[in-house]
């Protein structure tokens, strides 16, 4: 089961397609996910922020794949404690235990994992239609992170400026 779910997990997006993760097996069910320091890109990701985002995408793909197999992925984030935000810790990002659980349902997103690709084309400068934004908002059910849309050009520019400044910090 671990190999099957990892086949989907490794399709997660990563900075410059570096796939900066390392996986180890412990016991029969545990997967230990860590950042592979040999794959970091200090020039454009000095504190590993993008590597950690990539690890999160890896875990999401793993979770979706586990559900498709009738397993629950019990994910323990930063089991050694939360890392210092200014460095890339050597401690594991997560311990994942795969538990057979026939009550879990296959998420329809699972079927899209192999379809994901990097779009390197220039973005169109059109706004997300209100109807599409409403459909996305209605389908979103992860309460820890808010989802919202804006057609306010000043707000969009302000958020874009903050994102650019975040790369300098």
What kind of feature is each model-predicted range?
Residues 1-169:
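Acidic, surface-exposed loops and disordered segments
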């Amino acid at each position: 089961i671990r190999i099957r779910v990892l086949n989907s997990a490794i399709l997660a997006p990563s900075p410059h397609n570096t796939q900066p993760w390392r996986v180890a097996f412990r016991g029969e069910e545990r997967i230990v996910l860590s950042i592979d320091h040999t794959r970091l890109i200090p020039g454009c990701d000095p504190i590993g922020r993008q590597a950690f985002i990539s690890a999160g995408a890896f875990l999401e793909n793993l979770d979706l794949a586990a559900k498709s197999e009738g397993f629950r992925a019990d994910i323990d984030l930063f089991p050694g404690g939360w890392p210092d935000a200014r460095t890339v810790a050597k401690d594991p990002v997560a311990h994942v235990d795969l538990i057979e659980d026939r009550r879990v349902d296959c998420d329809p997103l699972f079927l899209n994992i192999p379809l994901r690709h990097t779009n390197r084309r220039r973005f169109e400068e059109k706004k997300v239609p209100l109807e599409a934004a409403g459909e996305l908002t209605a389908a979103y059910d992860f309460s820890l992170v808010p989802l919202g849309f804006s057609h306010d050009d000043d707000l969009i520019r302000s958020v874009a400026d903050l994102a650019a400044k975040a790369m300098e910090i």
